[in-house]
């Protein structure tokens, strides 16, 4: 029951047109979320991958995709740790370090997106250049 309720809540957020949903190279994350909570990503509204916007803001070639750590350092002057990225995310409960890692990854995306858009605007560029 708890898993179904969680899936329904996540699904409502994903379908909400008024809620900004940002990711960073997030295709795999969405696939894993769908596998864990079947149906929760069906009908997702406005999920934006911030990575291409960051790439454009940093003036990188279209084939170059910066990592989140590099993007945060370059656009926000913030150093984030990626140590937990390769830890065991299947094990439960998640460790305190994993929770902090996940929260940091999620909470940094809005300021990162704003910084990338601001840099593009100051250079009179669009995110798809």
Predicted features and spans:
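Conserved DEDDh/DEDDy metal-dependent 3′-5′ exonuclease domain
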Residues: 1-115
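Acidic two-metal-ion nuclease catalytic site recognized across multiple nuclease folds
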Residues: 108-129
